[in-house]
Regions:
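Activation segment/activation loop of eukaryotic-type protein kinase catalytic domains
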Residues: 1-16
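Conserved end of the kinase activation segment
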Residues: 20-33
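Hydrophobic anchor on a C-lobe helix of Hanks-type protein kinase catalytic domains
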Residues: 46-47
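Short proline-rich PxxP-based motifs
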Residues: 62-74
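Conserved C-terminal C-lobe helix
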Residues: 74-88
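Terminal C-lobe "cap" of eukaryotic-type protein kinase domains
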Residues: 89-113
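Regulatory extensions appended to serine/threonine kinase catalytic cores
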Residues: 112-233
Length: 233
């Protein structure tokens, strides 16, 4: 009696609340994972130019509760990968703040190129001239209609001739390109500045990252350290 303020567990602006806080009877309060889901919604809103991943109007909170979303207004595959992780309906499956900051979406260009070089050093790229047909087919599907299709014709002819060699030319596919990047940075340092890989092939990093994630290459000891940031722990 005489209470002038009512404290509730659930708070927040309509359509900007995490799934677990929509059900006030659940007794679940706000946690870091709650903030992560809302941050994912906001990230999509900003990148997409004003769209909500769970829709709008009366259906928005229902979609949040049911985990129904769309990321159709964002083209960046790396951004979508992070947003999808952040807005997962299961709080336990969302990234931590540290995971979020370490995600490739926030990597500078130098780190992205270095990652491609590291992928080019993996056994699959090393054996690009005798690659498994199934792997090549899967990569071809990923590379279809991408900027790096027929990549050899887009590299400066003098540089391509220099690296190609007479006996072992690079195959004109994604594995061949990754091996080319690796060898360029390993053995032809003086020529590295003559080609801007990320500008020439803007969708290469996203395609390779998503493919490597799907194939669990990123979990290998040679690559997994790239997905941690000691400075934010």
């Amino acid at each position: 009696m005489g209470q002038t303020t009512l404290h509730t567990i659930s708070a927040g602006t309509k359509c900007w609340k995490a799934r677990e806080t929509l059900d006030e009877d659940s007794g679940i309060g706000y946690k870091r994972s709650t903030d992560i889901q809302v941050a994912g919604m906001l990230m999509y809103y900003i990148i997409s130019g004003g769209h909500h991943p769970f829709g709008k109007g009366i259906h928005c909170e229902v979609n949040i509760f049911q985990g129904k979303y769309t990321l159709e207004h964002v083209e960046d595959e790396v951004a979508k990968d992070l947003i999808e992780w952040m807005i997962n309906e299961d709080p336990e499956k969302r990234p931590t703040v540290e995971d979020t900051l370490a995600h490739p979406y926030f990597w500078p260009e130098e780190r992205r190129v270095e990652y491609l070089r590291k992928i080019g050093n993996e056994k699959e790229a090393e054996n690009c001239r005798k690659a498994d047909p199934g792997l090549l087919h899967a990569l071809d599907q990923c590379a279809e209609a991408r900027s790096f299709t027929k990549w050899k014709s887009k590299i400066p002819p003098e540089l391509m001739k220099k690296l190609d060699g007479k006996k072992k030319p690079y195959p004109d596919n994604t594995l061949g390109l990754l091996r080319f990047i690796r060898n360029l940075h390993e053995h032809y340092i003086e020529d590295v500045d003559s080609v801007d890989i990320l500008t020439m092939f803007p969708d290469l990093f996203g395609c390779v990252y998503k493919f490597a994630k799907k194939k669990e290459w990123n979990s290998r000891s040679s690559l997994k350290k790239w997905f941690h940031r000691e400075d934010v722990r």
